[in-house]
Amino acid sequence: MRVIAIIDYDAGNLRSVEKALTALGEKPVITSDSHEILSADKVILPGVGSFGDAMGRLHQYELVDVIRQVADQGTPFLGICLGLQLMFESSEESVGVEGLGLLRGTIKKIPDCPGPVSYTHL
């Protein structure tokens, strides 16, 4: 059976991701255990919150190098919302905080615009 690991680092919408995967017939495991993450067939990094706080939690749980290993070994890896942002090198939101560096670039803030502007919320 395929194992899909959802990384738990206290900054994610874990249950909604788990529920969606379960509805698709998958059996995901929510974990912060490095062995479970490294042995998974697929890995998901969800996220809600600020770039700096989330990177701090990944360091606290000693998951930064684990995630980099997952990418290096070619395991399919999906970042959702903040999880995708963390895959980049840095973010303007938290100047001086290094991201995972799996993708080149910096996450930019949406610039302020005069007048009413609507943004799509997904």
Feature annotation, model-predicted:
Residues 1-78, 82, 88, 95, ...:
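N-terminal beta1-alpha1 cap of cysteine-dependent amidohydrolase-like domains
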Residues 120-121:
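Conserved small/polar residues in nucleotide/adenosyl-binding loops
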